[in-house]
């Protein structure tokens, strides 16, 4: 697995052996960040199911200002910390070794706000649980990108999130959302996504 583009583009990322952690494929990461374009520049990123850090590291490589990575699996956590260190990203990266909800609560208490959330939870985790607590750390207008198995049901509407676009890449689907819409906008959001 390599970083696709940016300041550390082409560099190899460590990944734990086995099938527990599945880093986002390079072509999917490329498509995700191509869609976001300049929206990544200078932003704060939260990666609450970081695994080896492929998504958040790609964001940092493409100009994100800072990233918080959250991971609990020991092998993935070791790979994540080594990736951040090997790529010289320590000054802009923070790694929290705790469950996602606990980390989000901690960040909310600290007053942290993020303009980009990269959500790639274990496929078995229910969506309501995967997004639980996320709104507490999102800045108004934040992008939320959710990766899931394309065969699974699409994420249900979540208060404050307005769907923008979905895109399928083989067995993976990405859903792009914007945060900070009022309830009326959110309720009317069904016809807003442009599916490509």
Describe the role of every protein-language-model region.
Residues 1-196:
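Class I S-adenosyl-L-methionine-dependent methyltransferase catalytic core
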């Amino acid at each position: 697995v390599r970083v696709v583009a940016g300041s550390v583009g082409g560099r190899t990322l460590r990944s734990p052996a086995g099938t527990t952690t599945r880093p986002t494929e390079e072509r999917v990461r490329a498509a995700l960040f191509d869609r976001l374009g300049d929206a990544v520049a200078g932003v704060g990123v939260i990666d609450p199911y970081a695994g080896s850090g492929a998504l958040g590291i790609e964001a940092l490589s493409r100009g994100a200002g800072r990233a918080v990575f959250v991971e609990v699996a020991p092998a993935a956590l070791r790979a994540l910390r080594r990736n951040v260190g090997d790529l010289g990203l320590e000054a802009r990266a923070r790694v929290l070794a705790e469950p996602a909800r606990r980390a989000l609560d901690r960040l909310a208490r600290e007053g942290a706000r993020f303009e980009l959330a990269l959500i790639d939870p274990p496929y078995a985790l229910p969506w309501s649980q995967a997004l639980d607590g996320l709104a507490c750390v999102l800045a108004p207008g934040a992008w939320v990108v959710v990766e899931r198995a394309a065969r699974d049901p699409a994420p249900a509407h979540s208060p404050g999130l307005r769907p923008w676009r979905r895109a399928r890449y083989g067995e993976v689907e990405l859903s792009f959302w914007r945060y900070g819409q009022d309830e009326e906008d959110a309720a009317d959001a069904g016809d807003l996504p442009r599916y490509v």
